């Protein structure tokens, strides 16, 4: 049985992420979506919210599990008995960082391969960061995320605007 691990912050989970999970699920016996705690980033959603969102969107795939992790990816991959790390590449700009990370992971986990996947054409431009910014400014994100994710984003963005904008501006 080959287990693939697809790690990320998934803040929020987008249609592009789901596209990669769906395609990875067709290639591997099991796919573990590993949602990172991300101390270095300041996530919009808490780790529990990101896990719940991912489970709502991905729950219908029988061979996909969603788990959170903290610490080194290598430890999480070992805990999951992972043989492959799946990473998405949207553009050439993603490649340099992902290439360096794959090299480091190869040194830390020589028995595990990194597989790069490009999103389907209609999702190549989607970025969780950009989706969050659009939502925070009150824009329509329905083309980039699933309806359940959009509801989460709208509620969180409303809170953000109420806390960040002067009265009468949001």
UniProtKB/Swiss-Prot annotation:
Spell out the residues of the site Transition state stabilizer. 17
Query: Which CDD domains does this one have?
Result: PPAT
Keywords, alphabetical:
ATP-binding, Coenzyme A biosynthesis, Cytoplasm, Magnesium, Nucleotide-binding, Nucleotidyltransferase, Transferase
- Carries keyword Magnesium? yes
| Reactions catalysed | (R)-4'-phosphopantetheine + ATP + H(+) = 3'-dephospho-CoA + diphosphate
Any keyword Acyltransferase? no
Please provide the Gene Ontology terms (biological process) for this protein: coenzyme A biosynthetic process
Q: Which cofactor does it need?
A: Mg(2+)
- InterPro entries in UniProt: Cyt_trans-like (IPR004821), PPAT (IPR001980), Rossmann-like_a/b/a_fold (IPR014729)
Q: In which pathway does it act?
A: Cofactor biosynthesis; coenzyme A biosynthesis; CoA from (R)-pantothenate: step 4/5
Q: Which GO terms describe its cellular component?
A: cytoplasm
Which Pfam families does the UniProt record give?
A: CTP_transf_like
EC number(s) of the enzyme? 2.7.7.3
Q: Where does substrate bind?
A: 9, 41, 73, 87
Subunit structure, per the record?
Homohexamer.
Query: Which NCBIfam families does this chain map to?
Result: coaD_prev_kdtB (TIGR01510), cyt_tran_rel (TIGR00125)
Name of the protein this chain belongs to: Phosphopantetheine adenylyltransferase
